[in-house]
Amino acid sequence: MSAVDIEKQLYFQWCAFITNPQHHDIRLGQWFSIHYLKAEDSVTHKFWNATTLEAQRYIIQWLEDHCYTDTLPPKIEEARYGN
């Protein structure tokens, strides 16, 4: 599995996570840091201490930077534009 395949797999896992109402009370940054950023201590620290909204914005920016914007599901689109 290539690095791109792994990124895509993690991205879709994250999409499933954020769109599942059972998980809305869990800090997205915590989940994201565990799955994406284990080796980047300073970024991981930021995620562990982020509020859900801050984490959402940071993650959405990361997705935009990595060209995933054409496939964002509706709930992420809503968060992206603050709806």
Please report, for each region that a protein language model flagged, where it lies by residue:
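Short, structured coil/loop segments at alpha-helix boundaries
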Residues: 4-7, 39-41, 69
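Hydrophobic transmembrane signal anchors and adjacent membrane-proximal interface regions, especially
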Residues: 12, 16, 34, 42-45, ...
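Low-complexity, intrinsically disordered short peptide segments enriched in small/polar/basic residues
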Residues: 1-3, 15, 56-57, 73
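Charged low-complexity stretches with an acidic bias
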Residues: 54-83
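Acidic, low-complexity, intrinsically disordered interaction modules
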Residues: 21-65
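N-terminal acidic leader/helix
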Residues: 2-30
